[in-house]
Amino acid sequence: MNNKFKDFFGFGDNDSYEERDAYEEHYDEQEEMQNSNRPTNSRDSNVVSIKAGQAGSGPSKIVLYEPRVYSDAKEVAQNLLNQRAIIINFSRMDDASARRVVDFITGTVYALNGEIQRIGDKIFLATPPKFETDGKITELLDKKDTLG
């Protein structure tokens, strides 16, 4: 009877507990091996977010835009959100308004992890994150006298 109390409170013979622990460890190892040998469902491994699928479903677009007022910046930002690159020509805006639009678009591009580059006099290229741009045309802008 004394042993039953010791066993109940954990002061008894530890051999039975060691055997139980060894059995549980062996069972866990077998279960883990069975799960790793189980074929993966191809449907589970090809999960793609809806937004990512929509962005790559059609051809990529580059939008040409000439804003005239500051409120046009919202439409430019919406195109960036829709994964479209935008070439923006500010030649029809005064410098102060153009600077405000560039600041707005720069904030949008930063939030999306995209890029904005000046590619000409009052012309900018804004791209969403999945676009990559290479090269520079500033050398041509410096030599514009030789082109005409």
Curated annotation (Swiss-Prot):
One of its GO terms (cellular component) is cytoplasm. It comes from the Bacteria. The keyword Cytoplasm applies. Keywords: Cell cycle, Cell division, Cytoplasm, Septation. One of its GO terms (biological process) is FtsZ-dependent cytokinesis. It is found in: Cytoplasm. Belongs to the SepF family. This is Cell division protein SepF. The lineage of its organism: Bacteria, Bacillati, Bacillota, Bacilli, Lactobacillales. The gene is sepF.
